[in-house]
């Protein structure tokens, strides 16, 4: 959400349902736990509805959800807007022919994989994850989709941790978030 947009009152309800767990999974991390959001049907529905309201008229043909929590939000968005859902998986989870994109983590590297035939050249893609921190995973997802000829329209996350500057790594691609934690 940009600063000049009017804040939807549902966002405050969503924010109150996200539990912050200090020192998980390691000391110094303030973990944003969305499982408490999922336990509240109204807050979960409001979350999906806000994304659907934004994307239903943008001619999105594919919603790419990043494993694992991007699946939770991406699938119902895709269904509601009439787009196909493509799971972007961690290594060795997909059978058949895959394409992959490696990306760097704070300590080491990882990769995202998708089926080769899942996305067509010219598809209009939305990338969905639960949270953006450093932006590495979203960048890998965008690169993967671009390599098969898709046009990435926007990235969408429930939560942004702005102090980690992930938005700056997205090469100017729009990012829509519901909740910022400072």
Curated annotation (Swiss-Prot):
PANTHER family reported in the protein's UniProt record: ADENINE PHOSPHORIBOSYLTRANSFERASE, PHOSPHORIBOSYLTRANSFERASE DOMAIN-CONTAINING PROTEIN
HAMAP family registered for this protein in UniProt: Aden_phosphoribosyltr (MF_00004)
Physiological role: Catalyzes a salvage reaction resulting in the formation of AMP, that is energically less costly than de novo synthesis. May contribute to the recycling of adenine into adenylate nucleotides and the inactivation of cytokinins by phosphoribosylation. Possesses low activity toward adenine, but can efficiently convert cytokinins from free bases (active form) to the corresponding nucleotides (inactive form).
Family: Belongs to the purine/pyrimidine phosphoribosyltransferase family.
Protein's recorded name: Adenine phosphoribosyltransferase 4
Disulfide bonds: none
Pathway: Purine metabolism; AMP biosynthesis via salvage pathway; AMP from adenine: step 1/1
Primary gene name: APT4
Listed Pfam families: Pribosyltran
InterPro entries registered for this protein in UniProt: Ade_phspho_trans, Adenine_PRTase, PRibTrfase_dom, PRTase-like
Lineage: Eukaryota, Viridiplantae, Streptophyta, Embryophyta, Tracheophyta
Intracellular or extracellular location(s): Cytoplasm
Keywords: Cytoplasm, Glycosyltransferase, Purine salvage, Transferase
């Amino acid at each position: 959400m940009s600063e000049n947009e009017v804040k939807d009152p549902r966002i405050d309800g969503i924010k109150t349902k996200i539990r912050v767990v200090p020192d998980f999974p390691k000391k110094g991390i303030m973990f944003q736990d969305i499982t408490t959001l999922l336990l509240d049907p109204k807050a979960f529905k409001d979350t999906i509805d806000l994304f659907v309201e934004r994307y239903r008229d943008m001619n999105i043909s594919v919603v790419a959800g990043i494993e694992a929590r991007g699946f939770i939000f991406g699938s119902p968005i895709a269904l509601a807007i009439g787009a196909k859902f493509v799971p972007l998986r961690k290594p060795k989870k997909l059978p058949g022919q895959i394409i992959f994109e490696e990306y760097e983590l704070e300590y080491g590297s990882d990769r995202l994989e998708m089926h080769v035939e899942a996305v067509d050249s010219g598809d209009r893609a939305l990338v969905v994850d639960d949270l953006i921190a450093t932006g590495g995973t979203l960048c890998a997802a965008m690169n993967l989709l671009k390599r098969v000829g898709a046009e990435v329209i926007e990235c969408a996350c429930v939560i942004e941790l702005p102090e980690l500057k992930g938005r700056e790594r997205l090469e100017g691609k729009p990012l829509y978030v519901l909740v910022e934690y400072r």
